[in-house]
Amino acid sequence: MRQLNYYIFISTILTYNLTHGQGPRPVIRVGITAALKTENGSIGWAYTGGAVPLALQYLKSHGYMLNFDFEFHVEYTECDLANTVRAGLNFMKTNNYDVIIGPPCAPALKMMGTLSTIYKKPVLGWGFVSESEISDMNRFPFVASVLPSTKTLGVVTSKLLEIYGWDRVALLYFKNELDYCSSVVNDVEKSLYNESKSVQIVMKAEIDGSNSESTSATLQVVKTRARVILFCAHAGGEKRFYLIQAGLLGMNSSEYVHVMLSMRSVGFGVQTSVGKKPLTLSGLPPIWESFTVNPDGMEDLAKSVAAKMIVIDTSSEVRDKTFLQYMTKNIVYAIREPPLSCKVPECLITNATGMGAYARHLFDVFYMYGMAVSSLNSTDPNVYGNLSLLIPKFTTAFEGMTGEVKLNEDLARKPLYQVYGLNSEYDQISLIDISLINDTVNVVFNYADGNTEVWHFWGGTRPPDTPVCGFLGKSCPLPIFEQYRALVIVAIAVTILILLAIIICMSSKIRNRRVEQSRLHSEWQIHAIKLRLPMHRRASKSSQESETESASETENFTSKSGDTMTSEFKETYTIQYLENDLVLTTAHQVQELSQAEMMKFVKLRKLDHENLNKFIGLSIDGSRFVSVWKMCSRGSLQDIISKGSFSMDYFFMFCMIRDIAEGLHYIHKSFLRHHGNLRSATCLVNDSWQVKLADFGLQFLQDEEEKPFKKNMLWAAPEVIRGSLSIEQMDSSADIYSFAIVASEILTKREAWDLSRRKEGYEEIKYAVKKGGQFVLRPDLHIDIEVNQTLLALVKDCWCENPEERPSAENVCKVLFDMTPNTEDNLMDHVFSMLEEYTSSLEVEVGERTKELTLEKKKSDILLGRMLPKQVAERLKAGQAVEPESFDLVTVFFSDLVKFTDLASKCSPFQVVNLLNDVFSNFDSIIEKHDVYKVESIGDGFLCVSGLPNRNGMEHIRQIVGMSLCFMEFCRNFRIPHLPRERVELRVGINSGPCVAGVVGLSMPRYCLFGDTVNTASRMESNGKPSMIHMSEAAHSLLVNNYPYQFETNSRGEVIIKGKGVMETYWLLGKMSLSNQSTPPITKVNHKPRKIASFTDSELTNYSFRSVSPYVENLSDNDDEEIRRVLRREMMRVEV
């Protein structure tokens, strides 16, 4: 491209003001590197260069630079690095200019900044120069810019997402020749990963502003993944293009939030001289207007999307809006006039309108320099380019055309961001001010009620990042009226239609089933009836014989796989019989199978390799799909490693690692292309200690399943953990990473990542692997035996952070083949020699296991005694059946913590558990003091009974009543540590009557109660009141008849009880003192003597002896003489 340059001199250079007797005025020489034909709408010199003379005019109108003249030299480098170097040398070395206005693009400015460190010349930055590297004072100490770093934009974006609770976002950006938005988005993405652990970028895509079809396709994908969309556009046309495309796809509903990322201080505005009604805050026309000669009629559509948009931008509040409008209209004319007098064709376009996006930044950076030089008040030419003198002046705040401008010590603009929205009049308003001071984020809210001032276009509610009805809108239930409206309107007609539909559907279903069954009779389909558990192998045998044979049939597997298997293996696989062979089965959820998926089963069954576990088939005619695999009797590799009792030397480890690599290589060459779930739990070991890979090729059956083991992610590659790949998108490199983790387990003889010895937990490890970075986290390779160092290097290469740098499975196999030890023994011979050594230590281990078994038996006996009555537990241990037992009269107790749900809502889960533990532990202590059996506790409820399993005559009613009063006394005194003002209240129900008790179930047997007595006791509790003991009439009669004058009760009256009708019930108020007892008449006719020998000393002390004189005369001869003497003496003392 032809290089253009020219010199412009102000006419007053080297002139003398003879009137005032002054010498020639100082001349400041300014070198300008501009772009004439690059990004005209943003940094094009014809649309931005006029900002320099306008800034000079503005300076002089405010009393600055009155005694200075300027010499301008412009070179059009077009952001080319070579041209930039040539221009920089010309400015700094050859002509020794005072100050350089740098190129308006980051790579070229960094080159110019490098030259400035050599020649010590200040460089002023504007345009696309927000990259974080430019603000590095160590690299570019002479570069000053009026734009903040894009790194700060990322921090502000992360803070906004945190404020509004959005964790799931999409990230879109427009591409242009300078890759401005690409650099912005990259810095924002890094900040989101560093600042927030919860934000997930579900999609990151580039938008072509010239291709509406590709943009529409991209937005269609966004609609299925996100509702909060972050996007970056560098020009006003791109912003309006995005709004129109989003509106055409219906993304202007209340579900969507569009967040525009900007650093140009324009907010919702566009820098142009054409416009209808400018925005009040920025003085710029809104982005939804059409600025072409022939409007496209899309203003309303774009406006509807803009209403659902918020903007993160540097402060755009311009104080002098009059001059801004003047600048917008005259900038293209100012460049044609002195002092610049641009005469190139681009500057002389007669119909040119509008102002470049970064013209205001060019204005501010030159205005900042002019103020700094003026404030020095010196005519010494050496100070004009002395940055050490200018820096203190640069850091002085001033009001420019981009709002308030103030530079920090790094000569980058102190970021003052504002979150903009639109009010009900579609005028721009500032919602939030966010500033960064010393790495501290300061947030100032400019609204009082977010629902009315922020989210009014969203229906007054902040939209979530995930819609209630799902991203496809299929999760919302239909309203009941819509479901049954046809039945209400045409009931008779619908009935007839239903009958016809049933007949048609049944006929069609029968026909389709026959066709489907005939089509599915293939080699991979296994009928569910052919699969059976080992204990049901022969139904003709007796139960005891069947159990004996089942034990012998599975003895081989148990002895080889070990006494214990991991819970994951038990959850994943079930051992069953297929005909007469043991197989491994895995259950899957039922789903519709396509023709392609069924053909995949045929291909899976044909896969045959010595290091792949054979896929036998799939059962699809049961309640769940069941995949059937060949039996590997030694269990999984995870079982062998976790057990830790089998010694593995280097040859053994090497053979296992080689087997895994060979199996993985075969899968990668097959139609599967990847395993997708390689872990030590999916590496099975057969009789010959040969490792076989399993659980491959069926991921599409597991997509809808809940994964019970979250620690499976410990084997997943970083790109998989980040969620950027679906199962279909995974490739072989992710398997290579998982292979490295499994190999580390084998070499270290410890489970993945050795969590028991690491200070990091699962979540910390997962986050560190997901985050990546320069220093990545990987398992430790602490090996206690001598191994080939090449093998360790291979493992480290396989878990490389970059998937492209990981070796392929084929290369791994080649390296392992070259490392094969020189020995003629095979693995089985090696295993036999190891077993011979192992046998010598077997006796010692058997003795230790016997001791452990005895100890565990004692523990199990204690635990069983706590779960079941002693006599029941002994019968169960002896293998005897426990027959149900009937009890004529028992007392049943039910209790419930009142409003426990409300109380639990004020506590954390750990506090709830601790609260229940404190309360129920004290309840258990109270129960131990009474002849009461605790049946069970369910949640916050208690069920107890007295009178069974040990019969105690009529004592059961007194034991239950006494225990209930103790419960109430404890609740009155109990205080919740973390909620001292809250009280625990108990509601108790008591009933007496017959009952049947017995042990129910084989797995986790429980001692259960049956009978209407239990139901009535439950009704007493549910119909009671807080801190009250509610008794049925049966319990009350039993209490007052057998223990009169010992407990105080009160009739509640008749109450309607569910399932019982009207019942008269009673309140138990407490123990009755002698002062509260009814005094019987003093008469000896038909008097029945009454004993009080059962009273305790504490009770006698608390009684008022003024009311017991009538009882003294009624004592029988059989009463304790000592009690009579004490009572008489005390009564005489009181009367005196």
Curated annotation (Swiss-Prot):
Guanylate cyclase involved in the production of the second messenger cGMP. Regulates chemotaxis responses toward Br(1-) and I(1-) salt ions in ASE right (ASER) sensory neuron. It catalyses: GTP = 3',5'-cyclic GMP + diphosphate. It comes from Caenorhabditis elegans. This is Receptor-type guanylate cyclase gcy-4. InterPro entries: A/G_cyclase, A/G_cyclase_CS, ANF_lig-bd_rcpt, Cyclic_nucleotide_synthase, Kinase-like_dom_sf, Nucleotide_cyclase, Peripla_BP_I, Prot_kinase_dom. Glycans are attached at residues 40, 194, 252, 351, 377, 386, 438. GO terms for cellular component: plasma membrane. Residues 891-1021 form the Guanylate cyclase domain. GO terms for biological process: cGMP biosynthetic process; chemosensory behavior; chemotaxis; intracellular signal transduction; receptor guanylyl cyclase signaling pathway; response to salt. The keyword GTP-binding applies. The chain crosses the membrane at residues 486-506. Residues 533-833 form the Protein kinase domain. The lineage of its organism: Eukaryota, Metazoa, Ecdysozoa, Nematoda, Chromadorea. One of its GO terms (molecular function) is GTP binding. It holds the Pfam family PK_Tyr_Ser-Thr. Expression is biased toward ASE right (ASER) sensory neuron. Residues 1-21 form the signal peptide. CDD domains: CHD (cd07302), PBP1_NPR_GC-like (cd06352). Residues 22-485 are extracellular. Keywords: Cell membrane, cGMP biosynthesis, Chemotaxis, Glycoprotein, GTP-binding, Lyase, Membrane, Nucleotide-binding, Receptor, Signal, Transmembrane, Transmembrane helix. Residues 536-565 are annotated as: Disordered. The protein kinase domain is predicted to be catalytically inactive. Its main location: membrane. Belongs to the adenylyl cyclase class-4/guanylyl cyclase family. It is a single-pass type I membrane protein. Residues 507-1136 are cytoplasmic.
